[in-house]
A protein has these predicted regions:
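Extended alpha-helical targeting/anchoring segments
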Residues: 1-414
C-alpha cells in the first residue's frame, strides 16, 4: 500500500510547476502537470510528476498507489450494461493512468513544494538543476484544416430527433456533442502553454501518457473527495461573456430549468454513496464567467458512507449528468444512437488519486486529445424540449473556440 514520504520540502521561490515538469519529464517517462486558476488567481496546489508504469483504470484502482490519468466516457457501458457502445471511431484507449514514481505537490500559499513520492534527495537535486528548454528541436510545418463531425445540418437534424424523444417522454435532457479534428505541428507542451493563457480554468492539465496526450482547461468538477467529504459542481446554462451575462442566464427559463435538472441528478448521484441526511447544496445558481462563455454553477456536498471508497464515489457519479443528460441511463442510450461514434476521453474524467487521502476528478471537457499528430476536440450542448437547433450548434462552437485559438497560438510559436 501507498505510504507517503515523510515531509520533504523544496523551496519554490525560483521554481514554477511548469519548470518542475520540464525537469521531471526529461527521462522519457509518462508525465503529468495539474494546475488551477480560479477567478484570475492561481489555485492553492499544483501537482507535477512522472512514472514508468502506464495502466488501465482497473489496474490503477487495484495498485493502491498514487495515480494520475483519464477515464473515458465509454467506460459508462461497463457500469450500465443497457448502454450500447457505438462504432469505435479512432480506437483510443478507454482509460490510461500513470502510477506516480515521482510526485511533487506545490503549495502556492506557503511558497513551497512537497515531495510525496520518489527519493527525496534525488528529486530535490533534479528540481534544483538546470531547466531544459521547452522550445521544439527543429522547425516544422503548420497544421492542417479543421474537419467537423457531424456537419451543421447533421447536428441540427440530430437535435430535432432528440427533441422528438423528449416530447415522447424518453428523456428530459440529452447532451449531444460534435467533434473537430485538426492535424497540428504543435507539441502537447506547446498546446498546454497556449491553452493556460487563452482559457485559464479551475482544472488545467497536461498528461503525456505513452504516445497519447491530453491537454485541457476544464471548468467543472466531476467529483472530489478529501477524507470522507465528497462534492461535485454541476455546470449548466451557457451564454456569451460580457455585460448582462448573469442577468441573461438567471432570466432564462431554459437555462435555469436545465441547471436545476442537473443539480437534482448530482444530488441523486451523491446520495447513492453518502450518509443519509448529509447531502446538501453549498452553492446554487451562481453565474461564473470563463474566457469564452459564462455558466451557471452550483455545488453539492455530502459525507461518504464508511464502507465507500473514493473509487466507489467516482463510479457512482460517472459520467456526469452535464455531459449525458437526464435520466442518465436513457440519455446515454440515446447519445449512442444519435452520435454514432464513441466519445473516447471526452465527457469522461481526468483525475488524480492519493489512496486514503484524496481524489479529485474533473470532467474531460475543453480538452485537446493529441493522437499521432492530430488534435481531437469535442463539445456538447444540453438539448431540452424548447431547444433551438441552430443555437445549440453555435453553443458547441463557442465551447470549442478557446481550444482552436490555443492550437493556432501554439502553431504560431512552433
Amino acid at each position: 500500500m501507498f505510504a507517503m514520504n515523510a515531509l520533504t520540502v523544496v523551496s519554490t521561490d525560483l521554481l514554477t510547476p511548469l519548470g518542475a515538469y520540464l525537469r521531471l519529464r526529461e527521462d522519457g517517462r509518462a508525465s503529468f502537470l495539474l494546475e488551477s486558476v480560479e477567478k484570475g488567481r492561481l489555485g492553492r496546489h499544483s501537482f507535477v510528476g512522472a512514472g514508468s508504469r502506464v495502466v488501465n483504470f482497473a489496474e490503477a484502482e487495484a495498485c493502491g498507489l498514487p495515480v494520475v490519468g483519464y477515464l473515458g466516457y465509454d467506460h459508462a457501458a461497463r457500469l450500465e450494461p443497457k448502454v450500447p457502445l457505438p462504432e469505435d471511431g479512432r480506437g483510443l484507449p478507454e482509460s490510461r493512468f500513470v502510477i506516480a514514481d515521482t510526485l511533487v505537490r506545490f503549495d502556492h500559499g506557503l511558497g513551497m513544494a512537497e515531495v510525496l513520492c520518489g527519493q527525496p534527495s534525488a528529486v530535490s537535486d533534479l528540481l534544483a538543476g538546470p531547466q531544459p528548454s521547452p522550445a521544439p528541436a527543429e522547425p516544422r510545418a503548420k497544421g492542417g484544416a479543421t474537419r467537423r463531425l457531424p456537419s451543421r445540418h447533421e447536428y441540427e437534424r440530430a437535435v430535432v430527433r432528440a427533441k422528438e424523444h423528449i416530447r415522447n417522454g424518453d428523456a428530459f435532457q440529452i447532451v449531444l456533442s460534435q467533434r473537430a479534428e485538426r492535424p497540428t505541428s504543435a507539441s502537447a507542451l506547446e498546446l498546454y502553454r497556449s491553452l493556460r493563457r487563452v482559457n485559464p480554468s479551475p482544472y488545467l492539465f497536461l498528461l503525456e501518457l505513452d504516445g497519447l496526450a491530453l491537454v485541457g482547461s476544464s471548468p467543472e468538477t466531476l467529483v472530489k473527495a478529501g477524507g470522507r467529504q465528497a462534492s461535485l459542481n454541476p455546470i449548466a446554462g451557457t451564454t456569451r461573456p460580457g455585460e448582462g451575462d448573469a442577468e441573461r442566464l438567471l432570466g432564462s427559463e431554459k437555462d435555469r430549468a436545465e441547471h436545476v435538472m442537473l443539480v437534482d441528478l448530482g444530488r441523486n448521484d451523491l446520495s447513492r454513496v453518502c450518509r443519509p441526511g448529509t447531502v446538501r447544496l453549498a452553492r446554487y445558481l451562481e453565474p461564473e464567467r470563463f474566457s469564452h462563455v459564462t455558466h451557471l454553477v452550483s455545488e453539492v456536498v455530502g459525507e461518504l458512507e464508511a464502507d465507500v471508497s473514493h473509487f466507489d464515489l467516482l463510479r457512482a457519479c460517472f459520467p456526469a449528468g452535464t455531459v449525458s443528460g437526464a435520466p442518465k441511463v436513457r440519455a446515454m442510450q440515446l447519445i449512442s444512437e444519435l452520435e454514432r461514434y464513441r466519445r473516447g476521453p471526452y465527457g469522461g474524467a481526468v483525475l488524480y488519486a492519493l489512496p486514503g487521502e484524496a481524489l479529485d476528478a474533473c470532467i474531460a471537457i475543453r480538452t485537446i486529445v493529441l493522437d499521432d499528430g492530430v488534435a481531437l476536440l469535442q463539445a456538447g450542448a444540453g438539448i431540452v424540449a424548447d431547444s433551438n437547433p441552430a443555437a445549440e450548434h453555435d453553443e458547441c462552437l463557442r465551447k470549442l473556440a478557446a481550444l482552436e485559438t490555443a492550437i493556432e497560438l501554439a502553431e504560431a510559436r512552433a
